[in-house]
Amino acid sequence: MRFNRYNLIEAVKNNDINKINSILKSGKADINSKDKYCETALMIASCKGNLEIVKLLVDNGADVNIKSDIGNTALMFASEYGQLDIVKYLVENGADINIKDDAGESTLIHALEDSTKKEKSLEIVQYLIDNGADINTTNNYYGKTALMISSSEGHLEMVKLLVENGADVKAKDKDKDGWTALMWASCKGDLEIVKFLVESGADVNAKDKEGWSVLMEASYEGHLKVIKYLIENGKVNVNAKDDDGWTALMRASWRGYSEIVKYLVEKRADINIKNNNGKTALDLADSEEIKEVLRKTGAK
């Protein structure tokens, strides 16, 4: 029988271990060849979670660090698909934990990607960290760390795990736009993650590359509960300005969030402060209701 790369890959896709054995024994198939998606038999087996087949392929010379056309390795696939046993086996057999794909994402970041397997991803991330994964590594395009990604996706338990294992919760780590993990959580309105990050030492007054603070992000997105927590527990500067001279009150006023405007005014937000264009919160107000609130408190 004539064998080729597709015979082996199809056998792996079908979990047909007898056929895989037969093909490997023939010595006529390149075990590291790729299919039309540029994935090897080992990558496919790692996704599918068949440890017996993974072992068979590795024992017969499969390269554990070969990359797909976008730079993914078998370990990345196993991590992303929640295959803990295979992750362990590949690492024990020479898989490089800190290798990155073409987007600059490490195996650790790949392990965060399948939100349907959150419990399993926690175990995989902990295993990767225990075996030398760089917890503060960033991807190339956005410059986001695992902590930023988990904070933006609302995965509280992952955020806790990362911080407890040394992830940089302070403002030292920022993405390409200057955002911190706390900014991401505030923007998304995730109060529990915001609380945890603040309690863990996150800088509530950190600013991004345009001078936006955490409070401004929450005000722009309309997250009143987050705003209340930041002001009441975080010693946040209510009147901080961004690079255009806008304050949190201006952002809320412009966006039409009357309850946020009322609360910020109660907390002594400066109602007459002007931005770089000479505009006040009253000038920027989106509705008559907000204008009335501001006028009653002395806005001019």
Model region roles, listed by residue range:
Residues N4, C38, G71, G104, ...:
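Start-of-repeat signature of ankyrin repeats
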Residues D35, S68, D101, N139-N140, ...:
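Ankyrin repeat boundary/linker residues
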Residues V265, D270-K300:
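Leucine-rich solenoid repeat scaffolds
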Residues I31, V64, I97, I135, ...:
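Ankyrin-repeat inter-repeat connecting loop/turn
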Residues K19, E52-I53, I86, K120, ...:
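Conserved ankyrin/ankyrin-like repeat signature
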